[in-house]
């Protein structure tokens, strides 16, 4: 009687870390989560700092600062919905390039904008939408939420492109690197402390560096230069009597 036995090939000497664009993409994910968390985290602390009195007197500083930060997260949700609608029409590379550039411009604008007050529509969970008076820098940082909303998907798609059978392991590595959300804000807060508690906007150089790296990844770092590595899952079929 003749049968067919499936024999797995030897364990590959390669892994997701054998691909340069995946390694750079992993760094981009680490940086991205830090940017995503760091922008509203430091923004809220800046607005509610009693010594700086950014929002002025006679207002509920903590409530306003919280609603401004909440609006950032709301814009992230809006951005993801918009990203889902246009994602099939725009390449991951183009989308990441555009939102990284926009995020850079908004952040730099916030850092160097004059101290001019503007009315910002904000979301308050208890009262719905309303207008609050904040510095123009705060409004620009809130808009960064639209940019960060679609970065995860863009980075992931670029980083796993061409990985084939290594994609599953790559996903696990990505999930481990969300720790960037705790490290970059820590760096920002360290800068604030070093400046005597007044350098909140100065700390956004950390965010600028992160966004610049993601722009680099979209333009250059995402190119797969390891196409010689076999990525197909194969099995040998061995006949036996």
Regions found by a protein language model. Give the residues of each.
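C-terminal ends and interior cores of transmembrane alpha-helices
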Residues: 102-130
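Extracytoplasmic gate region of multi-pass secondary transporters
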Residues: 18-69
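A membrane-interface helix-boundary motif in multi-pass transporters
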Residues: 187-210
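A late C-terminal transmembrane helix in Major Facilitator Superfamily
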Residues: 162-195
């Amino acid at each position: 009687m003749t049968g067919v036995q499936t024999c797995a090939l030897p364990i590959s000497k390669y892994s997701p870390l054998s691909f340069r664009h995946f390694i750079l993409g992993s760094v981009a994910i680490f940086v991205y989560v830090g940017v995503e968390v760091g922008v509203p985290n430091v923004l809220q602390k800046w607005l509610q700092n009693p010594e700086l009195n950014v929002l002025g007197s006679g207002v509920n500083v903590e409530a306003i600062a919280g609603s401004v930060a909440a609006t950032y997260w709301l814009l992230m949700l809006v951005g993801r919905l918009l990203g889902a609608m246009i994602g099939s029409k725009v390449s991951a590379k183009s989308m990441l390039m555009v939102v990284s550039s926009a995020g850079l411009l908004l952040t730099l604008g916030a850092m160097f904008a004059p101290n001019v007050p503007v009315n910002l529509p904000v979301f308050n969970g208890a009262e719905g939408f309303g207008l609050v008076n904040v510095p123009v820098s705060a409004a620009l940082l809130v808009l960064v939420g639209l940019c960060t909303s679609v970065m995860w998907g863009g980075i992931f798609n670029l980083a796993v492109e061409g990985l084939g059978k290594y994609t599953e392991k790559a996903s696990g590595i990505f999930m481990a690197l969300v720790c960037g959300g705790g490290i970059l804000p820590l760096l920002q807060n360290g800068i604030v402390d070093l400046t005597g508690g007044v350098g909140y906007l100065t700390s956004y150089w950390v965010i600028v560096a992160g966004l610049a790296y993601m722009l680099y990844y979209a333009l250059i770092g995402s190119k797969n230069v390891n196409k010689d590595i076999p990525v197909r899952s194969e099995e040998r079929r061995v006949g036996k009597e």
